[in-house]
């Protein structure tokens, strides 16, 4: 019986360390965003994963848009996935510069500063109330044991961020854009 209690206590301790490390990393990211320190935001970001998450969302929204007007044939779907990812990757690279990423997380404005284009807004990470732990925990959705999503607000247009366990710390690994922002991004892509 003592072994069972000991094993359970060790399990609870490991679970608390796991959850605590996620909370501390999220708190560090929010602090870096609030201070406007782009260098700190970038050190707490897995940029290739964030770009990939943007590309996946843009490609899915693009295929949905094409499917609304007419059925997308399998060959078209394959071509869009092959060549469209290049176009979406170019868009994601422009959106995920250190300056644009810092502005997105701090103000919620999705923009391309190089072309002076604003694509929409979402809730900002800087406005997230981390002082109320119960609200914070209520917004977490576990995706995998090493990744979670954090909703930035209550509405669908609020958006979300994902954090991934990278070694011993958690890093920003994705940004869930609201449907309106994705629609604005897809409208800038060619239809053929």
Where on the chain are the PLM-derived regions?
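Hydrophobic membrane-insertion alpha-helices, especially the h-region
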Residues: 2-21
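Soluble, non-membrane globular domain cores that form compact, hydrophobic packing
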Residues: 8, 27, 190-192
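Alpha-helical transmembrane segments of polytopic integral membrane proteins
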Residues: 17, 23-26, 47
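Alpha-helical transmembrane signal-anchor/signal-peptide segments
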Residues: 25-40
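Short extracytoplasmic
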Residues: 38-68
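Alpha-helical transmembrane segments and their juxtamembrane interface "caps"
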Residues: 43, 139-140
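Structured, soluble extracytoplasmic/luminal domains of envelope-associated proteins
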Residues: 74-132, 136
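Short beta-strand edge/turn micro-motifs at domain boundaries
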Residues: 109-112, 117-126, 135, 145-191
């Amino acid at each position: 019986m003592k072994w069972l209690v000991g094993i359970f206590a060790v399990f609870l301790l490991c679970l608390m360390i796991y959850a605590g490390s996620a909370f501390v990393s999220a708190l560090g990211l929010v602090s870096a965003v609030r201070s406007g320190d782009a260098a700190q935001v970038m050190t707490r970001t897995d940029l290739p994963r964030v770009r990939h998450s943007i590309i996946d969302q843009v490609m899915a929204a693009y295929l949905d848009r094409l499917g609304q007007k007419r059925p997308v044939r399998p060959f078209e779907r394959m071509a869009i996935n092959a060549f469209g990812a290049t176009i979406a990757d170019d868009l994601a690279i422009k959106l995920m510069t250190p300056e644009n990423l810092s502005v997105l997380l701090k103000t919620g404005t999705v923009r391309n500063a190089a072309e002076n284009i604003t694509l929409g807004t979402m809730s900002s990470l800087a406005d997230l109330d981390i002082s109320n732990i119960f609200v914070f925990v209520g917004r977490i959705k576990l995706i995998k044991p090493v990744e979670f999503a954090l909703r930035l607000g209550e509405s669908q247009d609020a958006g979300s961020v994902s954090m991934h366990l990278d070694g011993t710390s958690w890093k920003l690994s994705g940004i869930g854009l609201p449907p309106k922002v994705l629609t604005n991004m897809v409208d800038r892509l060619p239809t053929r």
